[in-house]
Protein backbone atom coordinates (compact mmCIF):
# COMPACT_ATOMS: atom_id res chain seq x y z
CA UNK A 1 0.00 0.00 0.00
CA UNK A 2 1.63 3.24 -1.15
CA UNK A 3 1.24 6.79 0.13
CA UNK A 4 -1.33 7.69 -2.54
CA UNK A 5 -3.58 4.78 -1.56
CA UNK A 6 -3.32 5.65 2.13
CA UNK A 7 -4.14 9.28 1.38
CA UNK A 8 -7.15 8.22 -0.69
CA UNK A 9 -8.41 6.06 2.18
CA UNK A 10 -8.13 9.00 4.59
CA UNK A 11 -9.97 11.27 2.15
CA UNK A 12 -12.77 8.80 1.41
CA UNK A 13 -13.17 7.86 5.09
CA UNK A 14 -13.32 11.49 6.23
CA UNK A 15 -15.80 12.40 3.48
CA UNK A 16 -18.08 9.48 4.40
CA UNK A 17 -18.00 10.27 8.12
CA UNK A 18 -18.58 13.97 7.45
CA UNK A 19 -21.41 13.23 5.04
CA UNK A 20 -23.04 10.91 7.60
CA UNK A 21 -22.94 13.61 10.26
CA UNK A 22 -24.30 16.33 7.95
CA UNK A 23 -27.06 14.17 6.50
CA UNK A 24 -28.04 12.97 10.00
CA UNK A 25 -29.38 16.48 10.67
CA UNK A 26 -32.32 15.45 8.47
CA UNK A 27 -33.21 12.67 10.92
CA UNK A 28 -35.55 14.72 13.13
CA UNK A 29 -37.18 16.45 10.15
CA UNK A 30 -37.89 13.24 8.28
CA UNK A 31 -38.64 11.16 11.37
CA UNK A 32 -36.10 8.54 10.26
CA UNK A 33 -33.59 7.06 12.76
CA UNK A 34 -30.04 8.36 12.35
CA UNK A 35 -28.72 4.81 12.03
CA UNK A 36 -30.81 4.24 8.90
CA UNK A 37 -29.41 7.41 7.35
CA UNK A 38 -25.83 6.31 8.09
CA UNK A 39 -26.53 2.87 6.60
CA UNK A 40 -27.97 4.60 3.53
CA UNK A 41 -24.83 6.73 3.15
CA UNK A 42 -22.70 3.56 3.21
CA UNK A 43 -24.94 1.79 0.70
CA UNK A 44 -24.98 4.85 -1.59
CA UNK A 45 -21.18 4.97 -1.59
CA UNK A 46 -20.90 1.23 -2.18
CA UNK A 47 -20.77 -0.99 -5.22
CA UNK A 48 -24.22 0.00 -6.57
CA UNK A 49 -23.69 3.71 -5.94
CA UNK A 50 -20.35 5.45 -5.64
CA UNK A 51 -18.53 2.35 -6.81
CA UNK A 52 -16.54 1.63 -3.63
CA UNK A 53 -16.00 -2.13 -3.55
CA UNK A 54 -15.67 -3.45 0.00
CA UNK A 55 -16.03 -7.17 0.66
CA UNK A 56 -13.51 -7.70 3.44
CA UNK A 57 -15.62 -9.56 6.00
CA UNK A 58 -12.86 -10.04 8.62
CA UNK A 59 -12.27 -6.26 8.62
CA UNK A 60 -16.00 -5.65 8.99
CA UNK A 61 -16.06 -8.13 11.89
CA UNK A 62 -13.12 -6.32 13.53
CA UNK A 63 -14.71 -2.87 13.11
CA UNK A 64 -18.08 -4.13 14.34
CA UNK A 65 -16.71 -5.75 17.49
CA UNK A 66 -14.56 -2.73 18.36
CA UNK A 67 -17.48 -0.36 17.82
CA UNK A 68 -19.90 -2.48 19.86
CA UNK A 69 -17.41 -2.71 22.73
CA UNK A 70 -17.15 1.11 22.88
CA UNK A 71 -20.93 1.55 22.57
CA UNK A 72 -21.65 -0.98 25.34
CA UNK A 73 -18.99 0.58 27.59
CA UNK A 74 -20.63 3.98 27.11
CA UNK A 75 -24.08 2.47 27.70
CA UNK A 76 -22.93 0.84 30.93
CA UNK A 77 -21.40 4.10 32.17
CA UNK A 78 -24.76 5.86 31.71
CA UNK A 79 -26.99 3.11 33.16
CA UNK A 80 -28.04 3.75 36.76
CA UNK A 81 -27.93 0.73 39.08
CA UNK A 82 -31.12 2.11 40.63
CA UNK A 83 -32.94 1.09 37.43
CA UNK A 84 -32.07 -2.55 38.23
CA UNK A 85 -34.66 -2.54 41.02
CA UNK A 86 -37.45 -2.43 38.45
CA UNK A 87 -35.95 -4.19 35.45
CA UNK A 88 -33.04 -6.56 36.17
CA UNK A 89 -34.88 -9.89 36.28
CA UNK A 90 -37.43 -9.03 33.58
CA UNK A 91 -34.60 -7.90 31.29
CA UNK A 92 -32.59 -11.07 31.94
CA UNK A 93 -35.67 -13.15 31.19
CA UNK A 94 -36.06 -11.34 27.86
CA UNK A 95 -32.32 -11.73 27.18
CA UNK A 96 -32.45 -15.52 27.60
CA UNK A 97 -35.94 -17.00 27.29
CA UNK A 98 -36.99 -14.23 24.92
CA UNK A 99 -34.06 -14.77 22.56
CA UNK A 100 -34.65 -18.54 22.55
CA UNK A 101 -38.32 -18.12 21.61
CA UNK A 102 -37.57 -15.49 18.95
CA UNK A 103 -34.85 -17.72 17.50
CA UNK A 104 -37.11 -20.77 17.36
CA UNK A 105 -40.14 -19.05 15.82
CA UNK A 106 -38.11 -17.00 13.35
CA UNK A 107 -36.00 -20.03 12.44
CA UNK A 108 -39.02 -22.19 11.63
CA UNK A 109 -40.50 -19.45 9.45
CA UNK A 110 -37.15 -18.90 7.68
CA UNK A 111 -36.78 -22.63 6.95
CA UNK A 112 -40.25 -22.70 5.36
CA UNK A 113 -39.89 -19.43 3.39
CA UNK A 114 -36.44 -20.18 1.97
CA UNK A 115 -36.66 -23.98 1.64
CA UNK A 116 -33.90 -24.65 4.18
CA UNK A 117 -33.50 -27.44 6.72
CA UNK A 118 -34.43 -26.69 10.33
CA UNK A 119 -30.86 -26.12 11.57
CA UNK A 120 -30.20 -23.62 8.76
CA UNK A 121 -33.46 -21.84 9.58
CA UNK A 122 -32.60 -21.73 13.28
CA UNK A 123 -29.22 -20.23 12.39
CA UNK A 124 -31.03 -17.35 10.69
CA UNK A 125 -33.24 -17.02 13.78
CA UNK A 126 -30.19 -16.91 16.06
CA UNK A 127 -28.46 -14.30 13.91
CA UNK A 128 -31.42 -11.89 14.16
CA UNK A 129 -32.59 -13.05 17.59
CA UNK A 130 -31.15 -10.31 19.81
CA UNK A 131 -32.00 -6.64 20.09
CA UNK A 132 -29.17 -4.21 19.40
CA UNK A 133 -27.61 -2.01 22.09
CA UNK A 134 -26.49 0.67 19.62
CA UNK A 135 -29.99 1.00 18.18
CA UNK A 136 -31.75 0.90 21.57
CA UNK A 137 -29.46 3.41 23.31
CA UNK A 138 -29.63 5.73 20.29
CA UNK A 139 -33.38 5.63 19.67
CA UNK A 140 -34.69 5.57 23.27
CA UNK A 141 -32.72 8.63 24.43
CA UNK A 142 -34.93 11.63 25.20
CA UNK A 143 -38.24 9.88 24.42
CA UNK A 144 -39.65 10.42 27.96
CA UNK A 145 -40.51 6.75 28.53
CA UNK A 146 -41.29 5.51 32.01
CA UNK A 147 -38.41 4.00 33.95
CA UNK A 148 -39.65 0.40 33.87
CA UNK A 149 -39.86 0.33 30.07
CA UNK A 150 -36.59 2.19 29.45
CA UNK A 151 -34.58 0.14 31.95
CA UNK A 152 -35.99 -3.17 30.68
CA UNK A 153 -35.12 -2.39 27.06
CA UNK A 154 -31.65 -1.01 27.82
CA UNK A 155 -30.61 -3.83 30.16
CA UNK A 156 -32.04 -6.42 27.74
CA UNK A 157 -30.09 -4.98 24.81
CA UNK A 158 -26.89 -4.89 26.87
CA UNK A 159 -27.21 -8.49 28.06
CA UNK A 160 -28.88 -10.50 25.28
CA UNK A 161 -25.89 -10.67 22.94
CA UNK A 162 -24.28 -13.63 24.79
CA UNK A 163 -27.31 -15.81 24.08
CA UNK A 164 -27.43 -14.81 20.39
CA UNK A 165 -23.67 -15.31 19.93
CA UNK A 166 -23.79 -18.67 21.72
CA UNK A 167 -26.68 -19.94 19.60
CA UNK A 168 -25.09 -18.68 16.38
CA UNK A 169 -21.71 -20.30 17.07
CA UNK A 170 -23.33 -23.55 18.24
CA UNK A 171 -25.51 -23.84 15.13
CA UNK A 172 -22.57 -23.01 12.83
CA UNK A 173 -20.58 -25.81 14.50
CA UNK A 174 -23.50 -28.20 13.95
CA UNK A 175 -23.75 -27.33 10.26
CA UNK A 176 -19.99 -27.48 9.72
CA UNK A 177 -19.59 -30.85 11.48
CA UNK A 178 -22.85 -32.42 10.36
CA UNK A 179 -23.86 -33.22 13.95
CA UNK A 180 -27.38 -32.05 14.77
CA UNK A 181 -27.83 -33.51 18.24
CA UNK A 182 -28.27 -31.36 21.36
CA UNK A 183 -26.36 -32.15 24.55
CA UNK A 184 -26.59 -30.91 28.13
CA UNK A 185 -23.03 -29.64 27.71
CA UNK A 186 -24.48 -26.80 25.63
CA UNK A 187 -26.29 -25.50 28.72
CA UNK A 188 -23.10 -25.57 30.77
CA UNK A 189 -21.31 -23.74 27.95
CA UNK A 190 -23.97 -21.03 28.03
CA UNK A 191 -23.75 -20.68 31.81
CA UNK A 192 -19.97 -20.51 31.50
CA UNK A 193 -20.19 -17.67 28.97
CA UNK A 194 -22.50 -15.64 31.20
CA UNK A 195 -20.49 -16.46 34.32
CA UNK A 196 -17.07 -15.58 32.90
CA UNK A 197 -18.49 -12.40 31.37
CA UNK A 198 -20.10 -11.32 34.64
CA UNK A 199 -17.06 -12.07 36.83
CA UNK A 200 -14.47 -10.42 34.56
CA UNK A 201 -16.79 -7.50 33.81
CA UNK A 202 -17.52 -6.70 37.46
CA UNK A 203 -13.94 -7.40 38.56
CA UNK A 204 -12.42 -5.44 35.70
CA UNK A 205 -14.73 -2.51 36.39
CA UNK A 206 -13.69 -2.44 40.06
CA UNK A 207 -9.99 -2.59 39.16
CA UNK A 208 -10.37 0.22 36.61
CA UNK A 209 -12.21 2.32 39.18
CA UNK A 210 -9.38 1.91 41.70
CA UNK A 211 -6.77 2.67 39.05
CA UNK A 212 -8.47 5.85 37.80
CA UNK A 213 -9.00 7.17 41.32
CA UNK A 214 -5.45 6.45 42.54
CA UNK A 215 -3.16 7.68 39.76
CA UNK A 216 -2.53 11.26 38.68
CA UNK A 217 -2.72 11.90 34.93
CA UNK A 218 -3.50 14.72 32.54
CA UNK A 219 -7.29 15.19 32.52
CA UNK A 220 -7.63 14.12 28.89
CA UNK A 221 -5.97 10.76 29.57
CA UNK A 222 -8.61 9.41 31.98
CA UNK A 223 -11.24 8.75 29.26
CA UNK A 224 -8.61 7.01 27.11
CA UNK A 225 -7.57 4.87 30.09
CA UNK A 226 -11.20 3.85 30.69
CA UNK A 227 -11.67 2.91 27.02
CA UNK A 228 -8.41 0.95 27.02
CA UNK A 229 -9.44 -0.85 30.20
CA UNK A 230 -12.85 -1.66 28.73
CA UNK A 231 -11.26 -3.14 25.62
CA UNK A 232 -8.88 -5.23 27.77
CA UNK A 233 -11.90 -6.60 29.65
CA UNK A 234 -13.68 -7.29 26.35
CA UNK A 235 -10.72 -9.06 24.71
CA UNK A 236 -9.69 -11.03 27.82
CA UNK A 237 -13.23 -12.31 28.34
CA UNK A 238 -13.48 -13.42 24.71
CA UNK A 239 -10.10 -15.16 24.99
CA UNK A 240 -11.41 -17.13 27.98
CA UNK A 241 -14.56 -18.09 26.03
CA UNK A 242 -16.82 -15.77 27.99
CA UNK A 243 -19.16 -13.06 26.74
CA UNK A 244 -17.07 -9.98 26.00
CA UNK A 245 -20.18 -7.92 25.24
CA UNK A 246 -21.66 -8.61 28.68
CA UNK A 247 -18.30 -8.04 30.38
CA UNK A 248 -17.62 -4.62 28.85
CA UNK A 249 -21.20 -3.49 29.65
CA UNK A 250 -20.82 -4.53 33.30
CA UNK A 251 -17.38 -2.90 33.44
CA UNK A 252 -18.94 0.42 32.40
CA UNK A 253 -21.78 -0.12 34.86
CA UNK A 254 -19.40 -0.47 37.82
CA UNK A 255 -17.36 2.61 36.87
CA UNK A 256 -20.41 4.75 36.11
CA UNK A 257 -22.18 4.07 39.40
CA UNK A 258 -19.31 4.88 41.77
CA UNK A 259 -17.53 8.19 42.47
CA UNK A 260 -14.79 8.39 39.84
CA UNK A 261 -12.19 11.00 39.02
CA UNK A 262 -12.96 13.21 35.99
CA UNK A 263 -16.41 11.66 35.67
CA UNK A 264 -17.82 14.32 33.34
CA UNK A 265 -14.70 14.34 31.19
CA UNK A 266 -14.96 10.56 30.79
CA UNK A 267 -18.66 10.70 29.91
CA UNK A 268 -18.19 13.63 27.52
CA UNK A 269 -15.41 11.93 25.56
CA UNK A 270 -17.14 8.53 25.58
CA UNK A 271 -20.22 10.16 24.10
CA UNK A 272 -18.19 11.35 21.11
CA UNK A 273 -16.40 8.01 20.79
CA UNK A 274 -19.69 6.10 20.90
CA UNK A 275 -21.08 8.28 18.11
CA UNK A 276 -17.93 7.75 16.05
CA UNK A 277 -18.17 4.00 16.68
CA UNK A 278 -21.80 3.93 15.50
CA UNK A 279 -21.03 5.98 12.40
CA UNK A 280 -18.00 3.88 11.48
CA UNK A 281 -19.77 0.59 12.12
CA UNK A 282 -22.92 1.38 10.13
CA UNK A 283 -20.91 2.91 7.29
CA UNK A 284 -18.81 -0.26 7.00
CA UNK A 285 -21.91 -2.46 7.16
CA UNK A 286 -23.60 -0.29 4.52
CA UNK A 287 -20.56 -0.63 2.25
CA UNK A 288 -20.47 -4.38 2.82
CA UNK A 289 -23.92 -5.07 1.37
CA UNK A 290 -24.69 -5.25 -2.34
CA UNK A 291 -28.15 -3.64 -2.69
CA UNK A 292 -29.10 -5.40 -5.95
CA UNK A 293 -28.58 -8.76 -4.19
CA UNK A 294 -31.45 -7.87 -1.84
CA UNK A 295 -34.06 -7.58 -4.61
CA UNK A 296 -34.48 -11.33 -5.37
CA UNK A 297 -35.18 -12.11 -1.70
CA UNK A 298 -37.18 -8.95 -0.93
CA UNK A 299 -40.68 -10.46 -0.68
CA UNK A 300 -39.89 -13.54 1.46
CA UNK A 301 -37.45 -11.47 3.55
CA UNK A 302 -40.16 -8.86 4.15
CA UNK A 303 -42.52 -11.65 5.20
CA UNK A 304 -39.91 -13.00 7.62
CA UNK A 305 -39.27 -9.52 9.06
CA UNK A 306 -42.99 -8.92 9.61
CA UNK A 307 -43.38 -12.40 11.16
CA UNK A 308 -40.62 -11.59 13.63
CA UNK A 309 -41.93 -8.08 14.41
CA UNK A 310 -45.64 -8.95 14.68
CA UNK A 311 -45.55 -12.50 16.08
CA UNK A 312 -42.19 -13.88 17.27
CA UNK A 313 -41.08 -10.84 19.30
CA UNK A 314 -44.50 -10.20 20.93
CA UNK A 315 -44.87 -13.86 21.93
CA UNK A 316 -41.34 -13.94 23.36
CA UNK A 317 -42.11 -10.80 25.41
CA UNK A 318 -45.42 -12.19 26.69
CA UNK A 319 -43.72 -15.41 27.84
CA UNK A 320 -40.58 -13.68 29.15
CA UNK A 321 -42.52 -11.13 31.20
CA UNK A 322 -45.32 -13.47 32.34
CA UNK A 323 -43.86 -13.93 35.88
CA UNK A 324 -43.58 -10.16 36.44
CA UNK A 325 -46.96 -8.74 37.44
CA UNK A 326 -45.85 -5.09 37.54
CA UNK A 327 -45.83 -4.86 33.74
CA UNK A 328 -49.10 -3.56 32.29
CA UNK A 329 -50.40 -4.74 28.95
CA UNK A 330 -49.47 -1.47 27.23
CA UNK A 331 -45.89 -1.74 28.56
CA UNK A 332 -45.59 -5.29 27.24
CA UNK A 333 -46.98 -4.13 23.89
CA UNK A 334 -44.43 -1.33 23.64
CA UNK A 335 -41.51 -3.59 24.63
CA UNK A 336 -42.73 -6.02 21.97
CA UNK A 337 -42.67 -3.27 19.36
CA UNK A 338 -39.19 -2.03 20.31
CA UNK A 339 -37.40 -5.25 19.43
CA UNK A 340 -34.92 -3.13 17.48
CA UNK A 341 -32.36 -4.95 15.36
CA UNK A 342 -29.14 -3.20 14.41
CA UNK A 343 -25.46 -3.95 13.96
CA UNK A 344 -25.29 -7.16 16.02
CA UNK A 345 -27.32 -9.33 13.59
CA UNK A 346 -25.24 -8.10 10.63
CA UNK A 347 -22.00 -8.84 12.50
CA UNK A 348 -23.27 -12.29 13.50
CA UNK A 349 -24.17 -12.88 9.85
CA UNK A 350 -20.46 -12.50 9.04
CA UNK A 351 -19.73 -15.65 11.10
CA UNK A 352 -21.14 -18.11 8.50
CA UNK A 353 -19.27 -16.27 5.72
CA UNK A 354 -15.99 -16.62 7.60
CA UNK A 355 -16.79 -20.30 8.29
CA UNK A 356 -17.44 -20.90 4.57
CA UNK A 357 -20.93 -22.38 5.08
CA UNK A 358 -23.29 -22.98 2.14
CA UNK A 359 -25.97 -20.25 1.85
CA UNK A 360 -23.79 -17.90 3.94
CA UNK A 361 -24.45 -14.98 1.58
CA UNK A 362 -28.19 -15.59 1.94
CA UNK A 363 -27.89 -15.40 5.73
CA UNK A 364 -26.01 -12.10 5.46
CA UNK A 365 -28.47 -10.53 3.01
CA UNK A 366 -31.42 -11.66 5.13
CA UNK A 367 -29.91 -10.21 8.30
CA UNK A 368 -29.25 -6.89 6.57
CA UNK A 369 -32.77 -6.74 5.13
CA UNK A 370 -34.38 -7.50 8.50
CA UNK A 371 -32.26 -4.86 10.24
CA UNK A 372 -33.26 -2.30 7.61
CA UNK A 373 -36.97 -3.09 7.99
CA UNK A 374 -36.71 -3.08 11.80
CA UNK A 375 -35.06 0.35 11.92
CA UNK A 376 -37.41 1.82 9.30
CA UNK A 377 -40.67 0.42 10.67
CA UNK A 378 -40.08 0.12 14.41
CA UNK A 379 -37.52 2.90 14.83
CA UNK A 380 -39.47 5.46 12.83
CA UNK A 381 -42.78 4.76 14.59
CA UNK A 382 -41.32 4.59 18.10
CA UNK A 383 -42.38 8.11 19.34
CA UNK A 384 -45.92 7.69 17.99
CA UNK A 385 -46.35 4.20 19.45
CA UNK A 386 -45.04 5.38 22.85
CA UNK A 387 -47.69 8.12 23.01
CA UNK A 388 -50.42 5.84 21.70
CA UNK A 389 -49.68 3.17 24.33
CA UNK A 390 -49.26 5.83 27.06
CA UNK A 391 -45.86 4.69 28.30
CA UNK A 392 -44.45 8.23 28.37
CA UNK A 393 -44.33 10.47 31.44
CA UNK A 394 -44.14 14.28 31.62
CA UNK A 395 -40.49 15.38 31.27
CA UNK A 396 -38.61 16.47 34.36
CA UNK A 397 -37.29 20.06 34.19
CA UNK A 398 -33.53 20.11 33.64
CA UNK A 399 -30.77 22.75 33.75
CA UNK A 400 -29.67 24.22 30.42
CA UNK A 401 -26.12 23.10 31.22
CA UNK A 402 -24.14 21.36 33.96
CA UNK A 403 -20.44 20.95 34.70
CA UNK A 404 -18.40 18.97 37.21
CA UNK A 405 -16.52 20.67 40.04
CA UNK A 406 -13.36 18.64 40.62
CA UNK A 407 -12.76 19.82 44.19
CA UNK A 408 -11.29 16.43 45.16
CA UNK A 409 -10.57 13.06 43.54
CA UNK A 410 -14.08 11.60 43.69
CA UNK A 411 -16.02 14.85 43.92
CA UNK A 412 -19.69 14.63 42.96
CA UNK A 413 -20.30 18.38 43.18
CA UNK A 414 -21.70 19.95 40.04
CA UNK A 415 -22.55 23.43 38.76
CA UNK A 416 -26.08 23.68 37.34
CA UNK A 417 -27.15 26.62 35.16
CA UNK A 418 -30.85 27.57 34.96
CA UNK A 419 -32.59 30.17 32.82
CA UNK A 420 -35.65 31.52 34.62
CA UNK A 421 -38.76 31.48 32.43
CA UNK A 422 -41.23 34.35 32.77
CA UNK A 423 -43.97 32.03 34.06
CA UNK A 424 -42.00 30.75 37.07
CA UNK A 425 -43.41 31.64 40.45
CA UNK A 426 -39.97 32.70 41.71
CA UNK A 427 -39.85 35.71 39.35
CA UNK A 428 -40.13 38.80 41.56
CA UNK A 429 -39.12 36.86 44.69
CA UNK A 430 -36.03 37.64 46.75
CA UNK A 431 -33.42 34.89 47.04
CA UNK A 432 -34.01 34.61 50.79
CA UNK A 433 -37.60 33.56 50.06
CA UNK A 434 -36.54 30.51 48.06
CA UNK A 435 -36.64 27.13 49.77
CA UNK A 436 -33.37 25.73 48.45
CA UNK A 437 -32.72 21.97 48.73
CA UNK A 438 -30.37 21.05 51.56
CA UNK A 439 -26.71 21.08 50.51
CA UNK A 440 -27.12 23.47 47.56
CA UNK A 441 -25.81 27.02 47.13
CA UNK A 442 -26.44 29.79 44.61
CA UNK A 443 -22.99 30.63 43.23
CA UNK A 444 -23.69 33.37 40.68
CA UNK A 445 -26.44 35.31 38.93
CA UNK A 446 -26.21 36.70 35.38
CA UNK A 447 -28.61 39.38 34.14
CA UNK A 448 -28.11 40.05 30.47
CA UNK A 449 -24.32 40.04 30.10
CA UNK A 450 -23.71 41.36 33.61
CA UNK A 451 -22.48 39.23 36.52
CA UNK A 452 -24.30 40.14 39.73
CA UNK A 453 -23.25 39.29 43.26
CA UNK A 454 -26.32 37.52 44.69
CA UNK A 455 -27.50 38.35 48.20
CA UNK A 456 -30.60 37.52 50.16
CA UNK A 457 -32.33 40.69 48.96
CA UNK A 458 -31.60 40.11 45.23
CA UNK A 459 -34.91 39.95 43.34
CA UNK A 460 -35.13 37.47 40.46
CA UNK A 461 -36.21 38.65 37.01
CA UNK A 462 -37.29 36.87 33.84
CA UNK A 463 -34.40 35.53 31.72
CA UNK A 464 -31.93 35.60 34.63
CA UNK A 465 -29.24 32.92 34.48
CA UNK A 466 -28.76 31.29 37.87
CA UNK A 467 -25.71 29.15 38.71
CA UNK A 468 -26.28 26.64 41.51
CA UNK A 469 -23.83 24.24 43.17
CA UNK A 470 -25.28 20.89 44.21
CA UNK A 471 -25.44 17.15 43.62
CA UNK A 472 -27.24 15.13 40.97
CA UNK A 473 -29.89 14.03 43.47
CA UNK A 474 -30.84 17.71 43.99
CA UNK A 475 -31.94 18.09 40.34
CA UNK A 476 -35.67 17.27 40.82
CA UNK A 477 -36.08 19.85 43.60
CA UNK A 478 -33.99 22.48 41.79
CA UNK A 479 -35.93 21.86 38.60
CA UNK A 480 -39.19 22.76 40.29
CA UNK A 481 -37.65 26.00 41.54
CA UNK A 482 -35.86 27.29 38.48
CA UNK A 483 -36.47 25.36 35.26
CA UNK A 484 -38.87 25.96 32.44
CA UNK A 485 -41.54 23.62 33.74
CA UNK A 486 -43.98 21.78 31.49
CA UNK A 487 -47.45 23.29 31.25
CA UNK A 488 -49.51 22.52 34.31
CA UNK A 489 -52.25 21.22 32.06
CA UNK A 490 -49.91 18.42 30.98
CA UNK A 491 -49.35 17.37 34.60
CA UNK A 492 -53.10 17.51 35.31
CA UNK A 493 -53.97 15.47 32.24
CA UNK A 494 -51.40 12.85 33.17
CA UNK A 495 -51.39 12.65 36.98
CA UNK A 496 -55.04 13.53 37.67
CA UNK A 497 -57.11 16.15 39.48
CA UNK A 498 -54.91 16.43 42.58
CA UNK A 499 -51.60 15.14 43.92
CA UNK A 500 -51.54 13.53 47.35
CA UNK A 501 -48.54 12.97 49.65
CA UNK A 502 -47.43 9.35 49.69
CA UNK A 503 -47.23 9.23 53.49
CA UNK A 504 -50.89 10.23 53.96
CA UNK A 505 -52.71 7.51 55.91
CA UNK A 506 -55.15 5.42 53.92
CA UNK A 507 -57.84 5.74 56.60
CA UNK A 508 -57.68 9.55 56.63
CA UNK A 509 -57.92 9.74 52.85
CA UNK A 510 -60.85 7.31 52.79
CA UNK A 511 -62.75 9.18 55.51
CA UNK A 512 -62.31 12.60 53.90
CA UNK A 513 -63.31 11.53 50.40
CA UNK A 514 -65.86 8.83 51.06
CA UNK A 515 -63.78 5.90 49.84
CA UNK A 516 -64.26 2.31 51.04
CA UNK A 517 -61.30 0.65 52.76
CA UNK A 518 -62.50 -2.87 51.89
CA UNK A 519 -60.56 -4.38 54.80
CA UNK A 520 -57.34 -2.46 54.11
CA UNK A 521 -55.19 -1.29 57.04
CA UNK A 522 -56.29 2.28 57.80
CA UNK A 523 -52.81 3.16 59.11
CA UNK A 524 -51.03 2.09 55.92
CA UNK A 525 -49.42 4.98 54.00
CA UNK A 526 -51.06 5.60 50.63
CA UNK A 527 -47.70 5.22 48.85
CA UNK A 528 -47.14 1.75 50.33
CA UNK A 529 -50.70 0.75 49.40
CA UNK A 530 -50.25 1.85 45.77
CA UNK A 531 -46.90 0.02 45.59
CA UNK A 532 -48.68 -3.12 46.82
CA UNK A 533 -51.35 -2.71 44.14
CA UNK A 534 -48.70 -2.22 41.42
CA UNK A 535 -47.32 -5.66 42.29
CA UNK A 536 -43.64 -4.84 41.85
CA UNK A 537 -41.16 -2.00 42.10
CA UNK A 538 -43.19 1.14 41.22
CA UNK A 539 -42.07 3.85 38.80
CA UNK A 540 -43.40 7.29 37.91
CA UNK A 541 -46.43 6.85 35.66
CA UNK A 542 -47.71 3.57 37.17
CA UNK A 543 -51.50 3.59 37.41
CA UNK A 544 -53.89 1.48 39.48
CA UNK A 545 -57.65 1.60 39.95
CA UNK A 546 -59.18 1.63 43.43
CA UNK A 547 -62.69 2.72 44.47
CA UNK A 548 -63.53 3.58 40.86
CA UNK A 549 -60.68 6.12 40.98
CA UNK A 550 -57.39 6.21 39.03
CA UNK A 551 -54.24 6.57 41.18
CA UNK A 552 -50.98 7.49 39.43
CA UNK A 553 -47.45 7.46 40.87
CA UNK A 554 -46.34 11.10 40.48
CA UNK A 555 -43.03 11.26 42.39
CA UNK A 556 -40.61 8.59 43.59
CA UNK A 557 -38.52 9.23 46.69
CA UNK A 558 -35.78 6.62 46.35
CA UNK A 559 -37.55 3.25 46.41
CA UNK A 560 -40.70 4.70 48.00
CA UNK A 561 -43.62 6.52 46.42
CA UNK A 562 -43.40 10.20 47.37
CA UNK A 563 -46.58 11.55 45.74
CA UNK A 564 -49.64 10.05 44.13
CA UNK A 565 -51.92 11.69 41.56
CA UNK A 566 -55.63 10.93 41.77
CA UNK A 567 -58.33 11.22 39.11
CA UNK A 568 -61.95 10.96 40.25
CA UNK A 569 -64.83 9.83 38.03
CA UNK A 570 -66.38 12.58 35.93
CA UNK A 571 -68.79 14.68 38.02
CA UNK A 572 -67.60 13.36 41.42
CA UNK A 573 -64.46 15.43 41.93
CA UNK A 574 -64.20 16.52 45.62
CA UNK A 575 -62.45 19.55 47.08
CA UNK A 576 -58.67 19.53 47.54
CA UNK A 577 -58.62 18.49 51.23
CA UNK A 578 -55.31 16.74 51.83
CA UNK A 579 -54.31 17.13 48.20
CA UNK A 580 -51.39 19.42 47.50
UniProtKB/Swiss-Prot annotation:
Superkingdom of this protein's organism? Bacteria
A Gene Ontology molecular-function term? potassium:proton antiporter activity
Could you tell me which SMART domains the record lists for this protein?
Answer: CorC_HlyC
Residue ranges spanning the membrane: these are 6-26, 34-54, 57-77, 94-114, 121-141, 162-182, 193-213, 217-237, 240-260, 269-289, 292-312, 334-354, 366-386
> What are the subcellular locations of this protein?
Cell inner membrane
A single Gene Ontology biological process assigned to it is: cell volume homeostasis
Its keywords, alphabetically, are: Antiport, Cell inner membrane, Cell membrane, Ion transport, Membrane, Potassium, Potassium transport, Transmembrane, Transmembrane helix, Transport
Q: Cite the RCK C-terminal domain residue spans from the record.
A: 402-484
Coarse class of the protein's main subcellular location: membrane
One Pfam match: CorC_HlyC
**Catalysed reaction, written as an equation:** K(+)(in) + H(+)(out) = K(+)(out) + H(+)(in)
Membrane topology, record value = Multi-pass membrane protein
> Could you tell me which SUPFAM superfamilies the record lists for this protein?
FAD-binding/transporter-associated domain-like, TrkA C-terminal domain-like
Entry-linked Gene3D superfamilies: 1.20.1530.20, 3.30.465.10, Regulator of K+ conductance, C-terminal domain
Keyword Cell membrane carried by entry: yes
An annotated GO cellular component:
plasma membrane
Q: What PANTHER family does this protein's entry cite?
A: K(+)_H(+) ANTIPORTER NHAP2 (PTHR32507:SF7), NA(+)/H(+) ANTIPORTER 1 (PTHR32507)
- Family statement: Belongs to the monovalent cation:proton antiporter 1 (CPA1) transporter (TC 2.A.36) family. NhaP2 subfamily.
Q: What does this protein do?
A: K(+)/H(+) antiporter that extrudes potassium in exchange for external protons and maintains the internal concentration of potassium under toxic levels.
Q: Could you identify this protein by its name?
A: K(+)/H(+) antiporter NhaP2
Q: Which gene encodes it?
A: nhaP2
